[in-house]
Amino acid sequence: MQIWVDADACPGVIKEIIYRAAERRQIQTTLVANQMLRTPPSKYIRAIQVAHGFDVADAHIVDQVVAGDLVVTADIPLASLVIERGAHALNPRGEMYTTANIRERLTMRNFMEDLRSAGVQTGGPNAFSQADRQAFANQLDRFLAKIPVA
């Protein structure tokens, strides 16, 4: 099992939680971004810089992920693709995407995108909060508790 992070838009506080979990549980963790990332020195944590371009980091994650891996992403289409491959997807606000909820999330995302394309002001997500950070940490801990210790 490996953790993959769609790192371009992942909040720094979430990356810090992931770094601590990777060290504590000794889980290989890979951050993928189209920009240079600083990661703590660790044999469990690495960063991969991909070329700039639309969904290049997403494509790399989809190509590399295997069943049972965990992908941290707020990108709903990416979450859908990794779930199809048998991996798990967790967003930075602590919501685990599943086969039961991903289709609804994707439909809502597409609907909102259509509204924005039509000129409707839809607003964005709420500011990232301490409650979001705690929800992510709790969900990550629950997920990792199910994985045998290395």
From Swiss-Prot:
* Domain of life of the source: Bacteria
Q: Which InterPro entries match?
A: UPF0178
What the entry lists under HAMAP family is as follows: UPF0178
Tell me which family the UniProt entry assigns to this protein: Belongs to the UPF0178 family.
Designated name of the protein: UPF0178 protein Daro_2879
Output the lineage of the source organism: Bacteria, Pseudomonadati, Pseudomonadota, Betaproteobacteria, Rhodocyclales
